[in-house]
């Protein structure tokens, strides 16, 4: 909670190109993941950008349901998710998303039919832009320098952990965040 609280207030009023919907990883699991990343992922492996401070270590543990939403208002999303069942999540191994740019992304795989279903509902009903063809739910641990992520691939300390949530967070491109009940 300590990291999420700090990051939440630091990121208020930051403008983005798009809005998004995500679920929070609950505490104490979120704090344990942040602490693990600080202990196990070497500082020398971390990718940082002078232009975009969102890179580096992730300190707001979440699973994105959909990024790229054009609207800055949560109204449409609220209607779509209304009555959706509680979301159940199971964690998998650590994986690496490669990127043609200067970094790779160290992530924890997320297995959840509920998230897949909610992503499908949103992509079928809201205007959005995405450069990704396939939804791959995950929790980002850190952005690392190109080629440095593979040493963490397959680690399984989070594998099998589960959590549930009965809300999503609408993160508006205008910088505000709002919890939306399912």
PLM region spans:
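Histidine-dependent nucleotide/RNA phosphoesterase domain, centered on the 2H-phosphoesterase fold
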Residues: 8-182
């Amino acid at each position: 909670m300590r990291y999420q609280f700090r990051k939440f207030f630091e990121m208020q009023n930051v403008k983005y190109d798009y809005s998004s919907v995500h679920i929070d990883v609950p505490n104490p699991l979120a704090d344990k993941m942040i602490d693990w990343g600080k202990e196990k992922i070497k500082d020398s492996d971390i990718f940082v950008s002078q232009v975009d401070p969102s890179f580096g270590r992730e300190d707001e543990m979440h699973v994105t349901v959909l990024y790229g939403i054009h609207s800055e208002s949560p109204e449409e999303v609220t209607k779509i998710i209304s009555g959706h069942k509680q979301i159940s999540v199971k964690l998998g191994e650590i994986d690496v998303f490669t990127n043609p740019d200067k970094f790779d992304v160290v992530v924890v795989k997320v297995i959840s039919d509920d998230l897949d279903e909610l992503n499908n509902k949103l992509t079928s009903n809201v205007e959005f832009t995405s450069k990704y063809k396939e939804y791959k739910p995950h929790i980002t641990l850190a952005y690392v320098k190109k080629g440095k992520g593979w040493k963490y691939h397959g680690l399984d300390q989070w594998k099998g952990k589960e959590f549930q949530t009965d809300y999503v967070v609408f993160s508006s491109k205008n910088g505000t965040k709002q919890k939306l009940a399912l």
